[in-house]
Amino acid sequence: DTLPVLPRDATDRNRTSPFAFTGNKFEFRAPGSSQSCAGPMMTLNTIVAESLDSLAEELSSFAPETFLPQLQETLKRRISEHKRIIFNGDNYSEEWVKEAERRGLPNLKNTMTALHTLVNEKNVALFEKYGVFSRRELESRFEIFLEEYHRRIRIEGRLSWEMAATIILPALRNEYEQTVSALSRALDAKRTSGTAALQKLADKLGDALDSIVSDLDTLETALTSCHEDILVAMSQLRTSVDAAETLVNDRSWPLPKYREMLFIY
């Protein structure tokens, strides 16, 4: 009549879970540095409360003489019904994305999609059932989160524009001017060796300049539009800046590179 011994998982696999259950507790790893864990904890507690409520209601209907056999069947059925959410691989991998799709699990790939789940009828009904939030309280929080998200995206977009225009572009322009000057001197001296390489580098630097200037114009226009346009423009600008980083002299590049941030700073 006692519960069986359940071995405790001693591995570190849960490092890839957004809120990992590590033996006797949940660890929340998805919230950002400026966010509170209170929201995820409140939601998880409400979900657990509904699960326990549903289970208690079912168990209370069992007759004492058949309680244990029915309990075993109930536990087996519950595990079978919800086993699809268990994944013991790498949650960051493409394997899990494909596996989740095969299992019919939702995959919310951006903030806007995730925010809208707050006012889904199913979720509203859950919070109202247990007196956690009313519909209007959820709608007001959704509106606040939405407004805050738009504000942050515009701030990030404006900062991306300023960094590219005032830090990256001058460094790239200087590199282009130095390369063109070296090419001009080589041609004036009627040198044949090295001029083709200088010409090729100058062309690449010039293309990178044109690309970044064009992306800056696109981002500046997007900043007056919706968040989707800003995100697309920021992504394109980032691609152009990453390409420019490979062309500029390491000593002239004004920002830390990935390898420096990972292994030096």
Predicted region positions:
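Acidic, glycine-enriched catalytic cores built around paired aspartates
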Residues: 1-265
